[in-house]
Amino acid sequence: MEALGINPTLFIAQLINFLLLIFILRALLYRPVMNLLNERTRRIEESVRDAEKVREQLANARRDYEAEIARARQEAAKIVAQAQERAKQQEAEIIAQARREAERLKEEARAQAEQERIRMLSEAKSQIADLVTLTASRVLGAELQARGHDALIAESLAALDRRN
């Protein structure tokens, strides 16, 4: 070895120094660095798991939100349909009430017209009876007796009823 220019004691001392340096570096640097790298890897994996959990929770929250929105829309549509149905029922009730009121007013008008017709007919009969009596009195020149007067009125009214 000396022929190569290598001093064997120096070589052994340097080899021992190198091995000692490797042992010291391994004990002082390699293990802490490896522990640091392992810890970092563990934290990264944990962060990835946490991110995946958050993503799943977000997806679940989104599904819940969409389901709630769909439920709210259905509820709103149901409320609108119920309101429309109630409006139709109220409309039908109002129309029926208006028809009943119109029919009642029509019947009242018809009854009043019938009463007015009867009253006018009664007045007309009375006036005609008076006119017949007056005319008969003038034509005959004398006042009819009460009995004859009543018979003449009845006959005139019967003739008038036959015309109507």
Curated annotation (Swiss-Prot):
Compartment list: Cell membrane
InterPro entries in the cross-refs: ATP_synth_B-like_membr_sf, ATP_synth_b/b'su_bac/chlpt, ATP_synth_F0_bsu_bac, ATP_synthase_B_chain
Membrane-related topology note: Single-pass membrane protein
Transmembrane segments: 4-24
One GO MF term: proton-transporting ATP synthase activity, rotational mechanism
Stored CDD domains: ATP-synt_Fo_b
Gene3D superfamilies for the chain: 6.10.250.1580, F1F0 ATP synthase subunit B, membrane domain
Keywords from the UniProt entry: ATP synthesis, Cell membrane, CF(0), Hydrogen ion transport, Ion transport, Membrane, Transmembrane, Transmembrane helix, Transport
Principal location listed in the UniProt entry: membrane
Gene Ontology cellular-component annotations: plasma membrane; proton-transporting ATP synthase complex
Family note: Belongs to the ATPase B chain family.
PANTHER family noted in UniProt: ATP SYNTHASE SUBUNIT B, ATP SYNTHASE SUBUNIT B', CHLOROPLASTIC
HAMAP family: ATP_synth_b_bprime
Quaternary structure note: F-type ATPases have 2 components, F(1) - the catalytic core - and F(0) - the membrane proton channel. F(1) has five subunits: alpha(3), beta(3), gamma(1), delta(1), epsilon(1). F(0) has four main subunits: a(1), b(2) and c(10-14). The alpha and beta chains form an alternating ring which encloses part of the gamma chain. F(1) is attached to F(0) by a central stalk formed by the gamma and epsilon chains, while a peripheral stalk is formed by the delta and b chains.
Function: F(1)F(0) ATP synthase produces ATP from ADP in the presence of a proton or sodium gradient. F-type ATPases consist of two structural domains, F(1) containing the extramembraneous catalytic core and F(0) containing the membrane proton channel, linked together by a central stalk and a peripheral stalk. During catalysis, ATP synthesis in the catalytic domain of F(1) is coupled via a rotary mechanism of the central stalk subunits to proton translocation. Component of the F(0) channel, it forms part of the peripheral stalk, linking F(1) to F(0).
The protein's name: ATP synthase subunit b
Organism field: Chloroflexus aurantiacus (strain ATCC 29366 / DSM 635 / J-10-fl)
Gene designation: atpF
